[in-house]
Amino acid sequence: MALKMRFLYYSKKAKMKDLAEAIKKEFDLAQNYNAIDVIPPAYSCENERLVILALSGNDLDDMVRRFCRELDKKKAQNVALLIDGNDKVAQTALDVLKETGTNVIENVKMVKFGGLPFIGGKLSDDEKKDLLDWAHSVVDSIK
């Protein structure tokens, strides 16, 4: 049985959408039509085994902060962070998520996608491999 998992992102960068699609394909999430979505998602999380939050920016947006505050154990048992930004965003998101009582994966992935929103092309093969390896390590850590 496949892992009940979602990849939610807050970014306008093309590489983030590309990564979302790669995760969906790698973990065979096609049966779940809302497995990848933007924050806030069209359908709320419910009893997810893992939610990967991918955030871009140098500050945690208030809408994202509110969304994170709602991710309790009933909505997401485990949450992992992928940050395209600075340590401040990562630490703020970690602090907010830990307050909810959900298990926050300590292995936060920091990336620098760079480029302008909607421009920046696709993930390189090396970037894709690195990010998928990280995602597998997160999934393995909760099995």
Residue ranges and their predicted role:
Residues V38-Y43:
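Short acidic active-site motifs
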Residues L3-R6, E26-N34, E46-K143:
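FMN-binding flavodoxin-like domain, especially the glycine-rich phosphate-binding loop
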